[in-house]
């Protein structure tokens, strides 16, 4: 449970960095508290999407992973970010990713920042 909480906090931080760096990834809302709560909920959705959907997509696209020497991971991460944006829209959350290439850059940013944060945050075993 602690591990899931740590990963959710890391994902929320990574998503915040992506929102900050890319104009086409938007997080609208009133106060800072509302935006923080929205980021945490979006991070939960992102974590669930990565936990449930991503392994299935990785198995189905395994030949493309082999052919591209792993670069197809960027496309899969972009699709997971777009799916998170779609789910957030259905849940009336004010998080939106505008376009595939923005999602590719956003997925790259989220992956790097999340990796860095997870390296420094406690494991929570």
Curated annotation (Swiss-Prot):
**Protein name stated in the entry:** Uncharacterized protein SCO3922
Look up the record and report any one GO term of the cellular component aspect: plasma membrane
Does the record carry Flavoprotein as a key word?
no
The answer to whether the entry has keyword Transmembrane helix is yes
Q: Which UniProt keywords apply?
A: Cell membrane, Membrane, Transmembrane, Transmembrane helix
| First-listed, main subcellular location of the protein, grouped into a coarse class | membrane
Q: Which InterPro entries match?
A: Phage_holin_4_2 (IPR007165)
Span-the-membrane segments of this chain are: 9-29, 33-53, 56-76, 100-120
Native organism: Streptomyces coelicolor (strain ATCC BAA-471 / A3(2) / M145)
The record's Pfam families line, in alphabetical order, gives: Phage_holin_4_2 (PF04020)
Q: Where in the cell is it found?
A: Cell membrane
Q: How does it sit in the membrane?
A: Multi-pass membrane protein
């Amino acid at each position: 449970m602690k591990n899931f909480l740590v990963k959710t906090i890391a994902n929320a931080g990574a998503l915040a960095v992506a929102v900050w760096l890319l104009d086409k990834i938007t997080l609208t809302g009133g106060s800072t508290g509302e935006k923080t709560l929205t980021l945490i909920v979006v991070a939960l959705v992102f974590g669930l999407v990565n936990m449930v959907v991503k392994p299935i997509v990785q198995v189905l696209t395994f030949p493309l992973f082999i052919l591209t020497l792993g670069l197809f991971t960027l496309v899969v991460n972009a699709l997971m970010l777009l799916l998170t944006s779609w789910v957030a829209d259905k849940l009336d959350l004010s998080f939106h990713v505008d376009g595939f290439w923005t999602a590719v850059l956003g997925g790259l940013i989220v992956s790097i920042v999340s990796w860095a944060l997870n390296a420094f945050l406690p494991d929570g075993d």
